[in-house]
A protein has these predicted regions:
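A short, hydrophobic beta-strand-centered structural micro-motif
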Residues: 73-88
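Mid-chain, structured segments of secreted extracytoplasmic proteins
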Residues: 66, 71-74
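A structural boundary signal for the start of the first folded domain, especially the loop/turn
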Residues: 1-67, 90-156
Length: 156
């Protein structure tokens, strides 16, 4: 990770805002406003409560970002924590499953605009659902087909 990024600094920022930055940058206030606006949008409510950390560099070991996100999630009240760098988006969540998170990560990193990426993360994560009534109906149809085939074979 960036040498100047400290867990304590990120935790302090996340205590007062759902957005934290790894470095001071002149674009941070505008980016904070965009990201906070995105977090308050209706299509992002499936991430709620969410914290977003913006880092300017991707570490040599991307797994360090997942560790950072998990440490932040464990130390805050955010149910979802997303760490975004120019090349990578990493998320952890206590209410999204791994498939939802990974789809969200891929969708987010494809968006160069970080606020649009947050919307993309939420849409992709929300789009992963198992339609249980349909799954059960298909399973019953398959089982019925097997039973009919077995009955026809037994009659011969």
């Amino acid at each position: 990770m960036e040498p100047e990024v400290s867990l304590d600094s990120l935790l302090a920022q996340l205590a007062t805002s759902p957005i934290a930055f790894g470095t001071d940058n002149p674009v941070n206030p505008a980016l904070r406003a965009d990201l906070e606006g995105a977090l308050h949008a209706a299509d992002v409510e499936n991430l709620d409560p969410a914290g977003v950390v913006v880092l300017e560099q991707t570490p040599a070991h991307v797994a360090d970002l997942r560790d950072l996100a998990q440490d932040l999630a464990n130390s805050t009240d955010y149910g979802t924590v997303i760490v975004r760098t120019p090349q990578v988006a990493i998320g952890v969540s206590d209410h999204l499953n791994r498939v939802q998170i990974e789809r969200g990560e891929r969708a987010m990193v494809a968006e160069p605009d970080y606020a649009d990426g947050l919307h993309a993360f939420a849409r992709a994560a929300d789009g992963v659902t198992v339609h249980w009534p349909l799954a059960v109906a298909v399973a019953l149809l398959v089982l019925a087909g097997i039973a009919v085939a077995a009955a026809m074979t037994a009659r011969r």
